[in-house]
């Protein structure tokens, strides 16, 4: 019994130290955001909750590190020291097609990384999200009767890392591309017409990435029955990165914050979700065996993509990065302002206590550290 207690205590201390080191790395990254290279990143977010169990395709968003939000519906260039914005399409949020939220609030529903709790429960997440809403999002989600917190899907705008693990795929961008993106989105009509089949969050990510990398993202008629999914957008981007090393693709993972909230699940495509689920597969096999066989072939042919359950940093070849292993060779870093992050082992445990925040790799010189392993959405 004493051995078990000591083991648990040691594990808890290790998680705390890893969390502090991660905060140091994130602080270094954000401090240099105004000087480092511009980039655009696809965020492929794991499914969670009841809807995620029914539809395990997850959610997708776009992170732009040199573009910031003048408001949730207006974009501007970032000032030195600002960390960029996450933009995505939502269903029934203020009647809008897209909403832009600063990175740290999007992930943690706070305005500074030092405020991120080390672990959370549902009540804490609700309190943090509502506090941010009352300060910044009343126009999109006004108070209910008697000043109460309103129901609705506004909760998807902040605190995402409390609910799920997020996988990121980053490519470099230029100031001219960012300026064009800002002009296009500030001028276009921002009216929601969400449709899960033809106009969903992954379709939005595809449109955004097409501005930066024309024709890089495409639907998969075979693996996803023509529906754009977060996993297909990621797969297309990875394939593009293989063929075009000049985009300097890198990958990162933002782990789900520890706590009592149920862990998110791996992202699936359409065919994959049907093939893997017994509640769909067995009835389909009985009723339409030919169709079921076709789905299995589709999944095996185009639906697979290596995303290890213990969520390491992985590269453009979908290879899992083991802790301490050298980063596989890819294009050399040609940007003298592109700062290298130190290896996590070199970080000092002096940052404020917080949860594991982000593990990121930008170049072959940096090493990856593993994220906490989850026990085994498009919300």
Regions found by a protein language model. Give the residues of each.
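Residue-level detector of short, conserved catalytic/binding motifs and their immediate flanks
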Residues: 40, 58-62
